[in-house]
C-alpha cells in the first residue's frame, strides 16, 4: 500500500536518526497501531524489526566503504551504545562488525 511504502522510504532515509515506530507512522499521517498492523500484514515483518534491519544494512555499508570506527558508526546510527550495536550486529549476522569489515575489505582488495 502507499502508506507502507511511504513508511519504508522514511525509515530507509532516516537510519541516522533515532527512529521510533510512532515517528515513522506519524510521517504517513496514520496512527502507530494502524501502521504496525498493515506493515506486518503486507511485509511479514514488524516495523521495529524493519527499522533495525535498515540500520544494520547501513552499518554494513559503512563498515565496507568507510573508515569510521565502531564507536562512530554506532553513534551515527543512534544505537544506545557501541556494545549494544556490536551485540545486535552479531546476533543478526553471526559475526562481529570488525570481523565483517575484515571479510569485506579482504574481498575488495
What are these regions (language model features)?
Residues 33, 83, 98:
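Key DNA-contact positions within bacterial/archaeal DNA-binding proteins
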Residues 8-9, 13, 18-22, 41-86, ...:
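Terminal helix-turn-helix DNA-binding modules in bacterial transcription factors
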Residues 27-28, 77-78, 89:
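Core residues of bacterial helix-turn-helix
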Residues 1-9, 13-36:
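Cytosolic nucleotide-utilizing catalytic cores of signal-transduction proteins
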Residues 91-94, 100-103:
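Non-catalytic C-terminal interaction regions
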